A protein has these predicted regions:
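Short helix-capping segments at alpha-helix termini
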Residues: 28-33, 59-60, 98-99, 122-126, ...
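Short, acidic loop-to-helix structural element flanking the phosphoryl-transfer center
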Residues: 76-105, 111-115, 143
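Active-site neighborhood of HAD-like aspartate-dependent phosphohydrolases
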Residues: 1-42, 56
């Protein structure tokens, strides 16, 4: 194993409370029916517009409006320290980095907010490459984010591990031909990880140190 690609939301950072709160505020601001927190949580990992269009029967223009409104609300509410890391994230990334693994992130989040989170959490020095939803033609679960990362490093799928908490992460990894690791402490469950046939399933990110 040479390269480990991480999802961000629900895998490295516990962003679920802020994301679902922002989604529910977006519904109210736009004047749409408010979905439940659990309904919102189930969509985490998809691009914003697709998220809103899956939650409600809205047209493309309203989907764009929801995505724009979400980003505006998120920018206000996302103060430094508003989002924390899951246990053992920092020390695990540090250990992997020291062992010589290349660490990358593939996220449905935009680059500006991701980099702000990484700086706030002091993780930027461990990450060699970032691919966001804006860098590819097709988002998760298509393989584009992983394919772009493999091309950047000139590394084969056989030497790569995709780590994420959502079925979209595992499906993306499978579609790109890399090994996959599902985490159970984020927004997905062990049952979901088993159902989408993750190669490995862990309850703590530190367990990766025993896999690679």
């Amino acid at each position: 194993m040479k390269l480990i690609i991480f999802d961000f939301d629900g895998t490295l950072a516990d962003t679920e409370p802020l994301i679902t709160q922002t989604m529910m505020k977006t519904f109210r601001t736009v004047g749409l029916p408010v979905c439940t927190r659990e309904q919102c949580r189930a969509m985490i990992g998809l691009p914003l517009k697709e998220t809103f269009m899956q939650l409600l029967p809205i047209d493309s223009a309203t989907g764009d409006l929801c995505a724009e409104t979400y980003e505006q609300i998120f920018a206000v509410d996302n103060r430094p320290g508003a989002v924390g890391m899951f246990p053992h994230v920092s020390e695990t990334l540090q250990a992997l980095h020291q062992r010589g693994y290349l660490l990358s992130i593939a996220t449905s989040r935009g680059r500006a907010s991701l980099e702000a989170f990484l700086r706030d959490m002091q993780l930027m020095s461990y990450i060699s490459h970032i691919v966001t939803v804006n860098d590819v033609e097709r988002a998760k679960p298509y393989p584009d984010m992983v394919d772009t990362t493999l091309s950047h490093f000139r590394i084969s799928p056989e030497d790569t591990l995709m780590v994420g908490d959502a079925i979209y992460d595992i499906q993306m990894g499978h579609n790109a031909g890399v090994r996959t690791c599902g985490v159970t402490y984020g927004n997905g469950t062990r049952e979901q990880m088993e159902a989408c046939a993750a190669d490995h399933i862990i309850d703590d990110i530190a367990d990766i140190l025993n896999l690679v």
